[in-house]
Amino acid sequence: MDLPGPIHDFLLVFLGSGLLVGGLGVVLLPNPIFSAFSLGFVLVCISLLYILSNSHFVAAAQLLIYVGAINVLIIFAVMFMNDSEYSTDFNLWTIGNGITSLVCTTILFLLMSTILDTSWYGVIWTTKLNQILEQDLISNSQQIGIHLSTDFFLPFELISIILLVALIGAISVARQ
């Protein structure tokens, strides 16, 4: 979107804070239904961030695939589960939780130090040069198809396998 600077910055901060609040809701809410709705909120915020960065096709795909299909499937799977599974044996803190928290905190600080130490000027300049070269050649949907079949083939296939495993897991949980 071609918005003035302050409005763009406000929307960016608003959506970023929505992502943080929604992510905390996914992790911290004890009720799995509320956690699934919080995940849907996070996915919608990500889609709005794509719209804010002029990636309308990716935003539409995000809404249709993740919010419209995957999150609805997760909500149905959670609704078919027994509530007794979550109400009994609720430990507030275990050793596994501590190890997981330590690993996640370490990864967070490593990412923050990497982001702060990276020279983003060169990355932005290279990206702009590539965009200038690719803009004249073909349309946006053709560019997406070329990148998905060449540069992003392996990540695209890995994501499709992860989604397939999530679908099979959700169906098996729902059947039990």
UniProtKB/Swiss-Prot annotation:
The gene is ndhG. It catalyses: a plastoquinone + NADH + (n+1) H(+)(in) = a plastoquinol + NAD(+) + n H(+)(out); a plastoquinone + NADPH + (n+1) H(+)(in) = a plastoquinol + NADP(+) + n H(+)(out). Belongs to the complex I subunit 6 family. The chain crosses the membrane at residues 10-30, 32-52, 61-81, 92-112, 152-172. It comes from Arabidopsis thaliana. Its EC number is 7.1.1.-. GO terms for biological process: photosynthesis. It comes from the Eukaryota. This is NAD(P)H-quinone oxidoreductase subunit 6, chloroplastic. Pfam families: Oxidored_q3.
